[in-house]
Amino acid sequence: MPDDAGCFPLPVLREGAALRGVLSVEPALPKVLEALGGVRRVLPDGVVIYTGADTNTGRWNEARWRARWGAIAPPALADMLGNADQPVTVLRHRIPMILARTASRIAARVPQPAGIRSDTGHESVELVSETISHRGFFQTRTYRLRHPRFDGSMSAEVEREVFVASDAAIVLPYDPQRDRVLLIEQFRLGPFGRGDARPWMLEPVAGRIDAGESAEDAARRECEEEAGLTLESLEFVTSYYCSPGCLTEYHYCYLGLAQLPEVNQGHAGLSTEHEDIRTHVLPFDKAMEIVATGEADNAPLILMLFWLQANRARLRRTA
């Protein structure tokens, strides 16, 4: 099992090798292991194991694995086992999102400043029950809970639902020498589900932060995948909950400095993810014009264009 074997490394059969561990009797585990790429093997003593491909990349380093994956693996496995009623192909498709939303939950443990707002913590909420009311690529959880009120009392027991997603990296590519930005356009299900007359959106580059990946690395990867663009550097803009009343998704926003192409339009996206993306390279003034007209009508794009407006002179001066 090599060091880069991922969150759930599988053993490789080697002559004379030994593996210490606990044999699981969890009935759903074989399907999860198969979805993770495991091959079922029956050993001479009748023990069934699932093995991975022999990539000849060396021995597995437990300490390195624990540092990167130790906190993610147990809750992610529990989530996978909860999805084991699905066909293997469906479960395999869901695994990256399961890992990503587990990683986002762990990232949320790092507290943000509380200079004005209350510093009352997560542990002060009295959780009565938590159920998963929908399991799909995304997840919906239903909570029954009581929380502290500002007068010092506890609230009545309330039932609330939350849509559980992963964290995301958002990037606005900007060429300070040409004073141009790159936007992407694609069909979006949120506007379609709302009944929007035009469910194609102009947006910054954006995408899921995979488990074990930094927000910065995700930002660079998404620019390559969605726009065919290699960034020169990143400037952190801000981070925030995009809709804290009902959604767990958390955004990490960056300005990506790059040399943008001369062509105004292009086509990009990963065919494996059924992406159909058109890119637009716009002068900064034109980008601000579509904010004024309302054609730019999603929060990340508007927020980041206003940030660029405030920082544009500095960026152009140092380009």
Predicted regions and their residues:
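Glycine-aromatic micro-motifs
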Residues: P2-V125
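NUDIX/MutT-family hydrolases
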Residues: A268-E295
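Active-site-adjacent beta-strand/loop module that shapes the phosphate/pyrophosphate-binding cleft
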Residues: Y50, R146-R149, S243-Q265
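Conserved hydrophobic/aromatic beta-strand scaffold that supports enzyme active sites
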Residues: T140-T142, L183, C253-L255, T279-V281
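Conserved Nudix-box catalytic region and its N-terminal flanking loop in Nudix hydrolases
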Residues: R160-A165, L172, Q177-R221, S271-E273
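Short amphipathic beta-strand and strand-loop transition segments with alternating hydrophobic
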Residues: E123-H134
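A contiguous pocket-lining binding segment that forms or flanks enzyme active sites
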Residues: G212-L257
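Acidic, metal-coordinating catalytic segment for phosphate/diphosphate chemistry
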Residues: S133-R178
